[in-house]
UniProtKB/Swiss-Prot annotation:
Induction: Accumulates in response to Sinorhizobium meliloti inoculation leading to nodulation. Residues 71-110, 196-210, 294-306, 422-435, 532-558 have a biased composition (Pro residues). Transmembrane segments: none annotated. One of its GO terms (biological process) is nodulation. This is Early nodule-specific protein 2. Involved in early stages of root nodule development. The gene is ENOD2. Keywords: Nodulation, Signal. InterPro entries: Proline-rich_CW_protein. Residues 71-593 are annotated as: Disordered. Disulfide bonds: none annotated. Belongs to the nodulin 75 family.
Length: 593
């Protein structure tokens, strides 16, 4: 609607402008045409102006038609580029400098210093931690399995009778005379401490070879019989001199060798001894000596003189006389008479009698019976035995492993899971109570203090009980069943008699100094007795010596890629919108114009 109105206004203005120009040109035309005989041309001109302006004036009374507004899309105007794009300037690449040899005389060539070849040192093998070399254990060859019939019944497990140990009987107390009969004290010489004996440092014994433990199926060894623990009487013996404790390094008993659990079906054969792969010492390669770049004087080459080409005069061979070739006359033999070929009449022989083809009766084919599908017994494949990984194999070579021929193994029948009968535990026998006599306070006597050596905690030693199998000849002793109210009568203990006091030297006597053993440096603790040998180092020749300075090409400079500056994305202006025209009102209300 807006565009249409603008076009109508433009047309109206054009016609008004044409009318004004026409009216202004009337006097000029009148002047130019006054010499005419008539005003006929002026009337025609005025009539044309009226006819041109009449339609425009007539459209004023035409009611306008409403046309909905047309939203004209905004015209995109690119943002003004204030700064012109930068002009690409290629980088200045300087040409490489031409090598100019030095003006002075070339230096005297000194051959390069030849470094003596490195002395091959065998790989250092750290000896094990004071362990003798392991003895070669020959491979354990399993005997050929014998056929065992299927186990139908398991006999009851009979524990061997435990060895009977009589209960500990406390010896009767010795008679102590009464306290009032005190014998005269005997003279006790001064106690001289003997010098402590030197205890050598603890040396760990080499571990003994323990054969691989093969656990039988569901059969546990009978537990060791543990006698009842009887606490000895609480008697303090006189203190003995305890030298200062020197804690050895890790004084734990050597752990028992526990080989890896070998599964019965997977028994790996002993591997063949593979000697350690020792790289041969690298051969000495002398350094490559480039001779000095000195051109030797050219040898004198005499000018090549082409020998004179002595061409002997060509003497053609004498030609022999060839008589003229006379072709003999071609004599054709007289042609023989050929009688005319007469084709015999086409006579077919009489056909032979062919008896009718009689098919013989079909032979009886018995029904095809597939033989029973009998799989042949599978061949015994011995289990794949992976050789154990020895970091340091035994020093001696092993004999070649000979696989025994496989024998038939019957199907394994698992015996019934029977728990062994519980082992008999004898009742705990408490020792009889000790009678403690009444405490009699001795007379108050000031005795000099006794010197007690410093208490040093003994090392904690872990001892493992050794398995002692019960003797086969012991007879089973039934447990002693204690009858009710069978307490033994209390033993009579006489009154406590004070022992004569020990002689204590007077205070002015200085005690003997303690023996301090020399400080021994503990041996270093090795993490592993085996040390990986370092690989031999390869010989690297020295770098070559250049007699001319090397030519290094200039670095490759990649020209920058010109990219136009990223123009800002134009923000689309919000199109002009009009309010909803109220019904019955004209013209519409313009909002954003």
């Amino acid at each position: 609607m807006k565009c249409q109105r603008i076009e109508d206004d433009f047309t109206l203005k054009f016609y008004v402008f044409l009318l004004i120009n026409t009216c202004s040109s009337i006097p000029f035309l009148f002047i130019t045409t006054r010499g005419m005989a008539s005003m006929h041309s002026l009337a025609i001109l005025l009539l044309g102006v009226v006819m041109l302006t009449t339609p425009v004036l007539a459209e004023y009374y035409k009611p306008p038609t409403y046309e909905p507004p047309i939203e004209k899309p905004p015209i995109y105007e690119p943002p003004p580029t204030e700064e012109p794009p930068p002009v690409y300037k290629p980088p200045i690449i300087h040409p490489p400098p031409n090598y100019k040899p030095p003006a002075h005389t070339p230096p005297i060539y000194h051959p390069p210093h030849e470094k003596p070849p490195p002395v091959y040192e065998p790989p250092y093998e750290k000896p094990p931690h004071e362990e003798p070399p392991r003895e070669y254990q020959p491979p354990r060859e399993n005997p050929s399995p014998e056929y065992e019939p299927p186990h139908h019944g398991k006999p009851p497990y009979e524990n061997p009778p435990p060895e009977y140990k009589p209960p500990y009987e406390k010896p009767p107390p010795e008679y102590q005379p009464p306290h009032h009969e005190k014998p005269p004290p005997e003279y006790q010489p001064p106690h001289e401490k003997p010098p402590p004996e030197y205890t050598p440092p603890y040396e760990k014994p080499p571990p003994e070879y323990q054969p691989p433990h093969e656990k039988p199926p569901h059969e546990s060894s009978p537990p060791e019989y543990q006698p009842p623990h009887e606490k000895p009487p609480h008697e303090h013996p006189p203190p003995e001199y305890q030298p200062p404790h020197e804690k050895p390094p890790h004084e734990h008993p050597p752990p028992e060798y526990q080989p890896p659990h070998e599964k019965p079906p997977h028994v790996h054969p002993p591997p063949e001894y593979q000697p350690p792969h020792e790289h041969p010492p690298p051969e000495y390669q002398p350094p490559h000596e480039k001779p000095p770049h000195v051109h030797p004087p050219p040898e004198y080459q005499p000018p090549y003189l082409k020998p004179p080409h002595e061409k002997s005069p060509y003497e053609p061979p004498p030609q022999e006389y060839q008589p003229p070739h006379e072709k003999p006359p071609q004599m054709k033999p007289p042609s023989e008479y050929q009688p005319p070929h007469e084709k015999p009449p086409h006579e077919h022989p009489p056909p032979e009698y062919q008896p009718p083809h009689v098919h013989p009766p079909p032979e009886h084919q018995p029904p095809h019976e597939n033989p029973p599908h009998e799989n042949p017994p599978p061949e015994y494949q011995p289990p794949h035995e992976k050789p154990p990984h020895y970091e340091h194999p035994p020093p001696e070579n092993q004999p070649p492993h000979v696989h025994p021929p496989p024998e038939y193994k019957p199907p394994h029948e698992k015996p019934p899971h029977e728990h062994p009968p519980p082992e008999y535990q004898p009742p705990q026998e408490n020792p009889p109570p000790e009678y403690k006599p009444p405490h009699e306070k001795p007379p108050h006597e000031n005795t000099p203090p006794t010197h007690h050596p410093p208490h040093e905690k003994p090392p904690q030693e872990i001892s493992l009980p050794e398995y002692q199998p019960p003797p086969p000849s012991t007879k089973y002793q039934p447990p002693h069943e204690k009858s009710p109210h069978e307490n033994p009568p209390p033993e009579f203990a006489p009154p406590h008699k004070k022992l004569p006091p020990n002689y204590n030297p007077p205070r002015h006597e200085k005690p003997m100094p303690k023996y301090q053993p020399p400080h021994e440096k503990l041996p270093p603790v090795y993490k592993s007795p085996y040390v990986k040998t370092p690989p031999p180092q390869a010989y690297h020749p020295p770098p070559p010596i250049y007699h001319h300075p090397p030519f290094h090409p200039p670095p490759h400079v990649k020209p920058p890629v010109y990219e136009t500056p990223l123009a800002k994305v134009p923000q689309m202006k919000k199109p002009t919108r009009y309010n909803t025209r109220p019904f019955g009102h004209y013209p519409p209300y313009k909002k954003n114009q």
